[in-house]
From Swiss-Prot:
Taxonomic path: Viruses, Duplodnaviria, Heunggongvirae, Peploviricota, Herviviricetes
Protein name: ICP47 protein
Biased composition (Basic and acidic residues): 37-50
Biological source species: Cercopithecine herpesvirus 1 (strain E2490)
Low complexity composition-biased segments: 72-81
Region (Active domain): 3-36
Length: 81
């Protein structure tokens, strides 16, 4: 290999192009952003001691459907006979 080629490669490795450096910087920033998102998600995971949502309000008894609403549509009822 020519010494000029080796000198050019050596120069490139020691002084990367602005485009390559921008690529490296962007990847570093994206990794930092992803790490921060992972940390925030880990903090947001619910623990039994501190749930994300308050417990649902309890009702005395859930409403029961009437016999007419509970009957299957194809089943004959006293009113339809």
């Amino acid at each position: 290999m020519s010494s000029r080629y080796l000198a050019a490669v050596d120069d490139y490795l020691h002084h990367p192009s602005p485009r390559y450096q921008a690529h490296v910087d962007l990847r570093r920033e994206l990794r930092a952003y992803a790490d921060e998102e992972r940390r925030e998600a880990a903090r947001a995971i619910a623990h039994p001691e501190r749930p994300l949502l308050p417990p649902p309000a309890t009702q005395a008894a859930p409403p029961q459907p009437s016999t007419r609403e509970a009957a299957h549509p194809s089943a004959p009822t006293a009113a339809s006979s």
